[in-house]
A protein has these predicted regions:
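Conserved catalytic cores of phosphodiester-cleaving nucleases, focusing on short active-site segments
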Residues: 20-22, 30-36, 53
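Residue-level signal for short segments within beta-strands and strand-turn junctions
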Residues: 22-24, 65-67, 120
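Short His-Asn-centered micro-motif
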Residues: 11-14, 33-34, 64-66
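Hydrophobic/aromatic beta-strand patches that form the interior of the parallel beta-sheet core
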Residues: 30-32, 62-64, 115-117
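Catalytic cores of nucleic-acid endonucleases
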Residues: 36-88
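Hydrophobic anchor at the start of a short beta-strand
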Residues: 6-8, 61, 114
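Active-site metal-binding core of divalent-cation-utilizing nuclease and nuclease-like domains
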Residues: 1-26, 40, 106-108
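Domain-level recognition of nuclease-like catalytic cores that cleave nucleotide substrates
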Residues: 68-123
Length: 123
């Protein structure tokens, strides 16, 4: 499916603005949040922020994290993977920096599909 003219950025959604929002048939087909890596605590906050933007109908979401400063990208990958192993109901490693996860939202008692992607953009 192609989402021509259905994608917006910085879109108001529930509680705040999401970075990437794709609408299909009057529903959110995808909600994405982009962050700069600032440690695992900020990563957890970003997951909660993503959940805050989604409603009970929204099941396809993504957190995209960019590393700008940490020269040891492998340590970031390990931190995130450890968090995923501890918090995801299910997960699949797509490659060393992308995971497909099912996370449980306590507030709605629903499972949400979250793609987590890390990208190293250090110079």
């Amino acid at each position: 499916t192609h989402y021509v003219n259905m994608t917006t950025g910085e879109t108001f959604r529930k509680v705040g603005k999401t970075d990437i929002h794709i609408v299909f048939e009057n529903k959110a087909a995808f909600i994405g949040e982009c962050k700069i890596w600032n440690g695992i605590k900020k990563f957890e906050e970003a997951i909660e922020q993503l959940f805050g933007y989604s409603t009970w109908k929204d099941t396809k979401t993504a957190l995209i994290v960019f590393n700008k400063e940490n020269k040891n990208f492998a340590s970031i990958q390990q931190n995130v993977f450890s968090w995923i192993k501890s918090n995801a109901k299910r997960y699949e490693v797509k490659n060393g920096n992308i995971w497909s996860c099912v996370l449980h939202r306590e507030d709605t008692n629903l499972d949400v599909q979250v793609a987590i992607a890390l990208y190293d953009i250090t110079i």
